[in-house]
């Protein structure tokens, strides 16, 4: 079945993008910086607004950006891991969208899944960013075929 986190937008790519912008870090460097940190600063896992407030306070305290990013990745991975457990999914888990290119998030998710003993393989395809567009195109083709099929049946009924 379909499940999503009920905890605000704190697991979204937009959240990570906002934090990167606030920290003055290029989005393509976020994953590398996160993986390069030996520490992870704890971040609120309740809501994006609270997490952003945490980040503002961390910056004011002089916490290095890589530790903040690693903390954010761990927080997101923790929520995703809980979601995977609740959904009762099977391997492999394919991460799609822009977050699939964030090596820090994928690494944190793999660590979290291993720590939680979920026994799941996490896969992040090279072109995962196109998954949503491909899905939309397939859905559009399906809907167009149904609409055309229905109108043809209706025409046959009216004229036949």
Predicted segment positions?
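Glycine-rich phosphate-binding loops at beta-strand->alpha-helix junctions
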Residues: 85-112, 125-129
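Glycine-rich phosphate-binding/hydrolytic loop that grips phosphoryl groups
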Residues: 13-21, 123-159
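Short beta-alpha connecting loops at secondary-structure transitions
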Residues: 1-6, 91, 115-125
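Glycine-rich phosphate-binding loop plus the immediately following alpha-helix
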Residues: 1-39, 138, 142
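A glycine- and small-aliphatic-rich helix-loop capping segment at beta-alpha/alpha-beta transitions
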Residues: 1, 108-117, 143-146
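Short coil/turn connectors at secondary-structure junctions
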Residues: 39, 63-64, 88-92, 118-119
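Adenine-nucleotide phosphate-binding core of ATP-dependent small-molecule kinases
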Residues: 51-83, 129
């Amino acid at each position: 079945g379909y499940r999503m986190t009920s905890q605000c937008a704190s697991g979204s790519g937009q959240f990570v993008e906002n934090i990167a912008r606030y920290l003055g870090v290029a989005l393509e460097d976020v994953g590398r910086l996160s993986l390069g940190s030996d520490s992870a600063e704890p971040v609120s896992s309740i809501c994006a607004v609270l997490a952003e407030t945490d980040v503002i306070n961390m910056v004011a305290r002089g916490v290095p950006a890589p530790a903040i990013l690693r903390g954010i990745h761990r927080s997101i991975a923790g929520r995703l891991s809980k979601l995977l457990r609740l959904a009762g999914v099977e391997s492999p888990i394919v991460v799609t969208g822009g977050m699939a290119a964030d090596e820090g998030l994928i690494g944190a998710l793999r660590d979290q899944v291993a720590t939680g003993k979920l026994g799941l393989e996490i896969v992040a395809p090279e072109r995962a960013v196109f998954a949503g567009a491909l899905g939309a195109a397939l859905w559009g083709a399906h809907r167009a075929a149904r609409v055309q099929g229905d109108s043809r049946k209706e025409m046959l009924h009216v004229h036949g």
